[in-house]
């Protein structure tokens, strides 16, 4: 993420980027801001269907990424420690009350975030939802003003 953000900033001469991530991608964006030097390069993070506090389904999937998304994993505990987040960066969590992957669905909410709930969409349905697209668009527009 860091290398990609640096290339974008260099090529566009922008001062900051807006990161948008779905599922684990939202956690990666958070980790970049909180632990990998992204605080000075990111304007806001828009997370879609991101298991900020883990998902019970991660126990059924092999691999490092799934292990990190397990409820109570050390990686998530470190990421959520004190739910610290730089106040100058807006974190938006768009989540579905009907997410069939982020279980429990409340795991997508974060105390330091602007939490936006939508209904009737599954985890992958969030990606193809006109409503979610409009929410993301609004967050981008707000972020560049």
Whereabouts are the PLM-identified features?
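Serine-dependent carboxylesterase/thioesterase catalytic core
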Residues: 1-85, 101-102
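Conserved beta-strand scaffold positions in the cores of enzyme catalytic domains, especially
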Residues: 45, 91-93, 115-117
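Short, proline-enriched alpha-helix->beta-strand connector loops that line the catalytic pocket
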Residues: 85-91, 110-114
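Short beta-strand/loop motif that positions the catalytic acidic residue
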Residues: 93-95, 99
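Short alpha-helix in the alpha/beta-hydrolase fold that links the catalytic acid
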Residues: 102-110
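Histidine-bearing beta->alpha loop at or near hydrolase active sites
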Residues: 120-124
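Post-His helix in hydrolase/transferase enzymes
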Residues: 127-140
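Generic C-terminal helix-cap and adjacent flexible tail
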Residues: 141-145
């Amino acid at each position: 993420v860091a290398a990609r953000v640096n290339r974008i900033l260099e090529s566009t001469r922008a001062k900051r980027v807006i990161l948008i991530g779905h599922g684990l991608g939202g956690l990666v964006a958070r980790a970049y801001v909180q632990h990998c030097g992204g605080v000075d390069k990111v304007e806001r993070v828009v997370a879609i269907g991101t298991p900020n506090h883990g998902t019970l389904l991660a126990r059924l999937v092999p691999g490092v990424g799934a292990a990190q998304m397990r409820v109570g994993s050390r990686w998530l505990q470190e990421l959520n420690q004190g739910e610290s987040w730089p106040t100058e960066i807006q974190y938006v969590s768009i989540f579905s009350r009907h997410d069939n992957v982020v279980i429990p669905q409340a795991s997508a909410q974060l105390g330091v975030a602007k939490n936006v709930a939508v209904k009737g969409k599954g985890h992958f349905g969030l990606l193809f939802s006109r409503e979610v697209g409009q929410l993301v668009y609004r967050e981008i527009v707000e972020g560049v003003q």
